[in-house]
UniProtKB/Swiss-Prot annotation:
Subunit field text: Forms a tight complex with rangap1 and ranbp2. Interacts with vsx1.
Signal peptide start-end: none
Subcellular localization(s) per the UniProt record: Nucleus
Pfam families: UQ_con (PF00179)
Main location: nucleus
Catalytic residues (UniProt): C93
Name under which the protein is recorded: SUMO-conjugating enzyme UBC9-A
Function (record text): Accepts the ubiquitin-like proteins sumo1, sumo2 and sumo3 from the uble1a-uble1b E1 complex and catalyzes their covalent attachment to other proteins with the help of an E3 ligase such as ranbp2 or cbx4. Essential for nuclear architecture and chromosome segregation. Mediates nuclear localization of vsx1. Required for progression through mitosis during organogenesis.
Domain called UBC core: residue spans: 4-157
Organism field: Danio rerio (Zebrafish)
Annotated positions for site Interaction with RANBP2: I4, V25, L57
Listed GO CC annotations: nucleus
Annotated stretches, region: Interaction with SUMO1: 13-18
Keyword flag Transferase: yes
């Protein structure tokens, strides 16, 4: 494991614990021996108020490679979400998470999670990852929002 990646992730964890957006979760997983695994984080993103996503808390796994922060983490909703920019596997399709697009080593975990929250309600139809959600979003917005609200209810923390 890269010392650079671990040191950066330890800094990220410290910064997150000191200050993070309300309702969001980002916690490194534990190894079988009880030690912290900074390369694998369990996160949760709340649906934004005033949107069909409101009320939901959407669980996401963030996996870091040894060359982080040179390469972005892989962000994957578990279970996968109904959304035009979420692959059927749950992986998020977002330009800041792609090395050959808008990824920059200075981007923080907080910025990634806020960016994904923004993407939930504002899909990028230029870069679809899920055919069904994309088609319904483009052809029947009322049905799309109905499904999103049902999903938010299903993933409500209460």
């Amino acid at each position: 494991m890269s010392g650079i990646a671990l040191s950066r992730l330890a800094q990220e964890r410290k910064a997150w614990r000191k200050d993070h957006p309300f309702g969001f979760v980002a916690v490194p997983m534990k190894n079988p021996d009880g030690t912290m695994n900074l390369m694998n984080w369990e996160c949760a993103i709340p649906g934004k108020k005033g949107t069909p996503w409101e009320g939901g808390l959407f669980k996401l796994r963030m996996l870091f490679k040894d060359d982080y922060p040179s390469s972005p983490p892989k962000c994957k909703f578990e279970p996968p979400l109904f959304h035009p920019n979420v692959y059927p596997s749950g992986t998020v399709c977002l330009s800041i998470l792609e090395e050959d697009k808008d990824w920059r080593p200075a981007i923080t975990i907080k910025q990634i999670l806020l960016g994904i929250q923004e993407l939930l309600n504002e899909p990028n139809i230029q870069d679809p990852a899920q055919a069904e959600a994309y088609t319904i979003y483009c052809q029947n917005r009322v049905e799309y929002e109905k499904r999103v609200r049902a999903q938010a209810k299903k993933f409500s923390p209460s």
